[in-house]
């Protein structure tokens, strides 16, 4: 049964994403429909979590918006609305889930990873 599910899911899994981890700063380009026209919107921030596997795999990106208010967006890896992902900076962290970043005020400093 599991092999059948994996075979069907493999059709929908995207391989064009770069490899990134929690702590990395990424820019996600999302297709947005406004009425009858479509445009691309960029969302830049720190990856605070990657969860799931297969078609249900998602990643959460957090940034500080206008007025110092934190904004988080969850993007599915398999979503056709996500056009592309750019890794701007590789961060060095010791956790898989960076929930503590939510409690930090101001700009977040994460050390850069050297690979």
UniProtKB/Swiss-Prot annotation:
The keyword Amino-acid biosynthesis does not apply. This protein is located at the 30S-50S ribosomal subunit interface and may play a role in the structure and function of the aminoacyl-tRNA binding site. One of its GO terms (cellular component) is cytosolic large ribosomal subunit. Keywords: Ribonucleoprotein, Ribosomal protein. SUPFAM superfamilies: Translation proteins SH3-like domain. This is Large ribosomal subunit protein bL19. The gene is rplS. GO terms for biological process: translation. The keyword Cytoplasm does not apply. It comes from Kosmotoga olearia (strain ATCC BAA-1733 / DSM 21960 / TBF 19.5.1). InterPro entries: Ribosomal_bL19 (IPR001857), Ribosomal_bL19_sf (IPR038657), Translation_prot_SH3-like_sf (IPR008991). Transmembrane segments: none annotated. Belongs to the bacterial ribosomal protein bL19 family.
């Amino acid at each position: 049964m599991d092999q059948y599910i994996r075979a069907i899911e493999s059709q929908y899994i995207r391989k064009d994403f770069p490899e990134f981890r929690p702590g990395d700063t990424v820019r996600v380009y999302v297709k947005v429909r406004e009425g009858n026209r479509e445009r691309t919107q960029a969302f830049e921030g720190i990856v605070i979590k990657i969860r799931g596997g297969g078609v249900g795999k998602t990643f959460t990106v957090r940034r500080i918006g206008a007025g110092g208010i934190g904004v988080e967006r969850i993007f599915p890896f398999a979503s056709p609305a996500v056009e592309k992902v750019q890794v701007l900076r590789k961060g060095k962290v010791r956790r898989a889930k960076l929930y503590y970043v939510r409690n930090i005020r101001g700009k977040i400093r994460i050390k850069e990873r050297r690979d």
